[in-house]
Amino acid sequence: MATRFPKFSQGLSKDPTTRRIWYGIATAHDFESHDGITEEKLYQKIFASHFGQLAVIFLWTSGNLFHVAWQGNFEQWVQDPLHVRPIAHAIWDPHFGQPAVEAFTRGGASGPVNIAYSGVYQWWFTIGMRTNLDLYRGALFLLFLSTLALLAGWLHLQPKWKPSVSWFKNAESRLNHHLSGLFGVSSLAWSGHLVHVAIPEARGQHVRWDNFLTSIPHPQGLQPFFTGNWSIYAQDPDSMNHLFGTSEGAGTAILTFLGGFHPQTQSLWLTDIAHHHLAIAILFIVAGHMYRTNFGIGHSIKEILEAHTPPGGRLGRGHNGLYDTLNNSLHFQLGLALASLGVITSLVAQHMYSLPAYAFIAQDFTTQAALYTHHQYIAGFIMVGAFAHGAIFFIRDYNPEENKENVLARMLEHKEAIISHLSWASLFLGFHTLGLYVHNDVMQAFGTPEKQILIEPVFAQWIQATHGKTLYGFDVLLSSNQSPALNAGANLWLPGWLDAINNGNNSLFLTIGPGDFLVHHAIALGLHTTTLILVKGALDARGSKLMPDKKEFGYSFPCDGPGRGGTCDISAWDAFYLAVFWMLNTIGWVTFYWHWKHITLWQGNVSQFNESSTYLMGWLRDYLWLNSSQLINGYNPLGMNSLSVWAWMFLFGHLIWATGFMFLISWRGYWQELIETLAWAHERTPLANLIRWKDKPVALSIVQARLVGLSHFSVGYIFTYAAFLIASTSAKFG
């Protein structure tokens, strides 16, 4: 007899209802709960799945390169990056009528195409690619890597090649290899690529495999390196008149510390980027020799944690027991990794627009908006996941005996103080920010805008001034001519930095006023409330005053309202569920702010943002409503244009989003009755009754319905805003 899905759970596979399918999908990746799982099998499965993940990533990037080379216009774009619209791929759609075919035939293409707003053209151009052949070679190489990763994954599941648990728990070796090998050597390799291929290409010198070994990246070769005259590599940088991709105005420097942006491309100097990666490489390669492994030298993390006695005994037993707690809990490790990755992803969003690294990307406004929004949403989901796995750690892996009186136990002991402080901060931010906005709305409505409460963000302006922004007249540190900081570092403070920070043509330290002050605090409210929900969910996951320890209840123990008595207090799943809504709303405010401020900057009417962002009606009317007009006219009774696909996605996104509420605000018995009625009708309808099912239809559980509702809400919300963002920006700037 064939085993029914799911094979990993015999108990579940025998369930006669549709619950078998839903629970099977829900627990497919919860390896810990599978039949016959051992610690060794668990680690090996996760290890092998990492190779699968790499294979998918390589295949995806290979596909990007291949489709652009096959159906894109990379070679035409390279000739004129500012005026040719980059093509992602062709659209094959038999449903298109003639008006649609004409509307979507752009960028010099012969048929309907999709425009690329991902920035890949600018990236490939910056790193030295120039022809379709370059793209094809890249695609083929990545396809080879993808196959290699799949083979490695399969190999490490074979008996002879399965690593042991002790190998996975050798933290020092893993840290050394990841620091030196993963970060250090890869940064060194990237610096090498920039110096040997990308920088020469930016100066009109074509370096490929046939002349790679004969083209010296610097006229003096390695002599300055071996003689210690490293500064020679920084002499003669590209001039301010350098035309990117040509020898006109090009210098010979390969590792510089200029600061600021290349005047033509509006992106960071490639020689600065190469220098940065070389410095990172050295730092990480050194760091990767820090921990004790084979030779009995270096640090032992366990010894460090146990030797560190907190001053005055104020933190109990400090970090005692933490090494084993962390090293034996995959959820703890994953939580920390996700928290780090979430922060980094958000920083990537901030730096991609303020310090653009890719040539001409700063002038492609739709791409800038898309990349910022994309990275902020990704960061939000990753951060929420960090807390979810932190909560699972407390439920499944935390052992109070092993952590007596250490910092982890003490944090749990004063969780009430942590939660109440976060609660107070959220309440303070919420009432004051909303109060200011609403007051300003009322003043606008009554025709007395001069009575608005407008607060200048003086502390933030002062911080901008210390970094060199002179506009506010603070005359402090780098913005002061007499400052010892400025004089002492005349050649150190990246000569181009001070020009860039005071130049109105980039997004570096944007000028801020009362509208920024208010939205900053609205975002702070969102961040603090999301954090409050997540922190409370994790700290109370194992129990509260009402229910001391719920280890056996598991993570997806549902909160069922006051009728069940106190279960909402200790449901980490429900905290996660609630936090996702707050996270999405917070990132909504972040992206609204970024987008509106930049639209007005790019259009040269920044006063619109400054005047309208101080009250809520301004946001609704002058940002959302005003910018959705082009979108809603994607197709109308007079015909259609290239925005029609975004108009359709905008409507469809709203539909998915609204469907979520059907699952979120409903009574479970109603669904069961509805399903039974549909099943009854199906079985009695000719033709339809030829199709039978073996599983008895059962309504979703509370947790499942919340998950389905939440996923619809999230996907619909993001679809809707993505369509709005891309259509409103591309309609204005192309």
From Swiss-Prot:
Question: Hey, which family's this protein in?
Answer: Belongs to the PsaA/PsaB family.
What does the note under cofactor report? P700 is a chlorophyll a/chlorophyll a' dimer, A0 is one or more chlorophyll a, A1 is one or both phylloquinones and FX is a shared 4Fe-4S iron-sulfur center.
PANTHER family per record: OUTER MEMBRANE PROTEIN, OMPA-RELATED, PHOTOSYSTEM I P700 CHLOROPHYLL A APOPROTEIN A1-RELATED
Please list the residues that bind chlorophyll a B3. M662, Y670
| Topological category with respect to the lipid bilayer | Multi-pass membrane protein
Residues annotated for [4Fe-4S] cluster binding in this entry: C559, C568
Q: Report the protein name in the record.
A: Photosystem I P700 chlorophyll a apoprotein A2
Q: Which GO molecular function annotations are given, in alphabetical order? A: 4 iron, 4 sulfur cluster binding; chlorophyll binding; electron transfer activity; magnesium ion binding; oxidoreductase activity
InterPro entries linked to this entry: PSI_PsaA/B, PSI_PsaA/B_CS, PSI_PsaA/B_sf, PSI_PsaB
Keyword annotations from UniProtKB, A to Z: 4Fe-4S, Chlorophyll, Chloroplast, Chromophore, Electron transport, Iron, Iron-sulfur, Magnesium, Membrane, Metal-binding, Oxidoreductase, Photosynthesis, Photosystem I, Plastid, Thylakoid, Transmembrane, Transmembrane helix, Transport
